[in-house]
């Protein structure tokens, strides 16, 4: 193990456990507050180490790197607080043993988002800085909703920063805002279930759980623990927003009619503040349920009466779904969630709808690469779990040749069966768990073929597709068996699609 340190201090230490993006941000923030640090990582040369060492050259920091499969027994000596990286699985070695020791010693374990929440509380006291905070979590769609919400807020005339799981880390964004003297009026936070596990005092003005499907069970242990981690963000929120199509998110609130609850879904909204979709005369619309123009004053509540609930209202059509540049029903639902978050700030519809119309989406998320011979090639490499792929297949509205496979993370692939049967012309399988997906899909009768690499996958898919179809890369799996990460997988797919176009004489 590699151990180095700068000047020692006798004060209790903060242990930064894991030097990913959030660990680096937490280390910078704690050093900025004058805390002596001990930084530990299983890797000898974690990414960003040199930059961190340069940034903390004048701070009191002890580095414990290259810990490997076991953290040293004295790692907790003198430690008052552990800042745990979301990349470390708490029930696996060596993290499990260290956290057990921390509990025995009454050492507090927090995450970077908890430090961010405490930082905002401190700034409220020292600078009277009280921004609005919006929080987004869910299995799929978090980044799209976070990025879109920020744009809608800025279109409405308020300054906003997006941070958290979307990158940059929340504390890195806060440090930057402080250094530039440019603190925003609104923070829009994308929060993963990992981050929520170690967050206790964040109290958003509004929070949304977009959906909950199987993912990260290797980290949480089971589906119940995963859903509970997502639900943590709703209880302290002033306004809770849920997907009424998803029973797991609906169960996170006491009642969909509650005054502090809003919902979105595929159906027409019935309660004031809710949003949904309406199909009228062959056109799908984004809709909102708004108060009637001449509502009577609410009657005085009698003693022991049940709590007041939201009333019904009138439906307003906002814009046709086809006017969105982002593709698929799942992205229409993402747009509804983003608008509800922005509306919680009392922003008007006009600027939001103009921005929504122009929003082109985030990379590797149902992203149109190009069309070749009347076949659309769509990069949904961020579809790293079954739920994301189901949403992509259901949302596109056309027959699909699906490219799927990779590292399955122990998921149940059976939810793919009905949507593949309905929407897929064929499936091209890649990666270590491609064969496992193929076996699950056998009852569909949909042709499944294997490909050794992305080049072969794209060309096999092109052969199977018919005019009007889409070739969809939505793997339902992690990428690390064949690629550096999901962006790399998407980039390779896009490059192979462009090569295919050149081979077929299509340049534009």
Curated annotation (Swiss-Prot):
GO terms for biological process: cell division; cell wall organization; peptidoglycan biosynthetic process; regulation of cell shape. It catalyses: UDP-N-acetyl-alpha-D-muramoyl-L-alanine + D-glutamate + ATP = UDP-N-acetyl-alpha-D-muramoyl-L-alanyl-D-glutamate + ADP + phosphate + H(+). Pathway: Cell wall biogenesis; peptidoglycan biosynthesis. Its main location: cytoplasm. Pfam families: Mur_ligase_C (PF02875), Mur_ligase_M (PF08245), MurD-like_N (PF21799). Coiled coil: none annotated. Residues 294-314 are annotated as: Disordered. GO terms for molecular function: ATP binding; tetrahydrofolylpolyglutamate synthase activity; UDP-N-acetylmuramoylalanine-D-glutamate ligase activity. One of its GO terms (cellular component) is cytoplasm. SUPFAM superfamilies: MurCD N-terminal domain (SSF51984), MurD-like peptide ligases, catalytic domain (SSF53623), MurD-like peptide ligases, peptide-binding domain (SSF53244). It is an enzyme of class 6 (ligase). It is found in: Cytoplasm. InterPro entries: Folylpolyglutamate_synth_CS, Mur-like_cat_sf, Mur_ligase_C, Mur_ligase_C_dom_sf, Mur_ligase_cen, MurD. ATP binds at residues 138-144. Cell wall formation. Catalyzes the addition of glutamate to the nucleotide precursor UDP-N-acetylmuramoyl-L-alanine (UMA). Belongs to the MurCDEF family. This is UDP-N-acetylmuramoylalanine--D-glutamate ligase.
